[in-house]
Amino acid sequence: MTINYQFGDVDAHGAMIRALAGLLEAEHQAIISDVLTASDFWGGAGSAACQGFITQLGRNFQVIYEQANAHGQKVQAAGNNMAQTDSAVGSSWA
């Protein structure tokens, strides 16, 4: 009986997670642009409230980016570890 694992799929999934994390920067900038367009809500673009919101938004995006990127790295590492273990076990049976 042959078992065929697709470790490349696991690596690709991890890479996709990391790529999506990278795309967050574009979304972040688009939201900042919208916030600045509606800055009158906070008392103007230079107001402490507007700048505070932008700062907090940046922190939130940074946390999300770091977590998504780290998760993608872990998925890729797990796939690599499984592939190496499978290869080692397979060669020991040969």
Swiss-Prot record:
It comes from Mycobacterium tuberculosis (strain CDC 1551 / Oshkosh). InterPro entries: ESAT-6-like_Myco (IPR009416), ESAT-6-like_sf (IPR036689), T7SS_ESAT-6-like (IPR010310). The keyword S-adenosyl-L-methionine does not apply. It comes from the Bacteria. Keywords: Secreted. Belongs to the WXG100 family. ESAT-6 subfamily. Forms a tight 1:1 complex with EsxW. Coiled coil: none annotated. This is ESAT-6-like protein EsxV. Its main location: secreted. Gene3D superfamilies: ESAT-6-like (1.10.287.1060). GO terms for cellular component: extracellular region. It is found in: Secreted.
